[in-house]
């Protein structure tokens, strides 16, 4: 897949025209491509981007058995003319070298984005690791045989000339929560409850959107007790540089709920310490539900810090073994985890440590991945998984026996 250049400023052309290009400097917006991603260094451009994207997004209802999947590869009879007016030649070529599938609807064929693959299988009610190994012709035939068995409603997300998701059409199973409205609601709530908040960074690709803020004015309220404990345990330098923050994540392709998590910023990489607010895209959820949930952010942030603080009381006799087992339990990327474990072992040797020491040492993992240019979406998943370490029963991992 081609590398996609990202954008961090304002747009000088419509970024939502098929594969539109920003002609300023070196930036190139190939927003129709599956591998597209972009970053933002200010909130307003990010909000503007999603407002325009939401305005040009189509949500279309149809019956599952009315969908027909077609192969799109070198041997496919479909060509650019089959998608006339819906996408660019570049988007067609991108799909041919990627997922290699298209869908026929009442008004013609649409490309299927890779983000739609899982939800398409869900509508067909099939799964299996062998499916991606099939030729596109065989895979399309299998999908059609299964799709045509089901008369339930589906809700298609059409964006940038491709089908980006094939959700259930039942409002109990999937509720649309426009990203621009979530962002606007979040900013209003942050300004009201956390005045002085500072936007740090934003990220968007076709699967996930995230944004993070720092909350410097609430440092004493949120981290005061924790910072004092750090200082009392010889970690005054760490205590002095940490500042509370929050990260927002959402997805309209089925990857994530609309959630806000607690962060500690100021270190080499933000430390994710747990989810505070989460509203699923289910059960007829509305933006108002997210707005109401945000009222609990301050209290939930305090609970997350208390959990982190409690790790300082969990003493480990075999911290290197414990770290190794916890990383395995949480499915941390092995190469980065091994490197972080080796660094921790060099620092602590055979000496005892606390679960807090190990948790902080694990923060090297996302930093290592970041330096290796790991995609942002994968980093977010790693950080969320790592935060689960705060709720583990550490005694189960603190064993003398070497890890196999």
Model-assigned labels for residue ranges:
Residues 4-5:
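Extreme N-terminal basic, low-complexity initiation segments
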Residues 22, 26-185, 194:
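Feature for intrinsically disordered/low-complexity regulatory segments and propeptides
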Residues 167, 174-404:
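Intrinsic disorder/low-complexity polar-acidic segments
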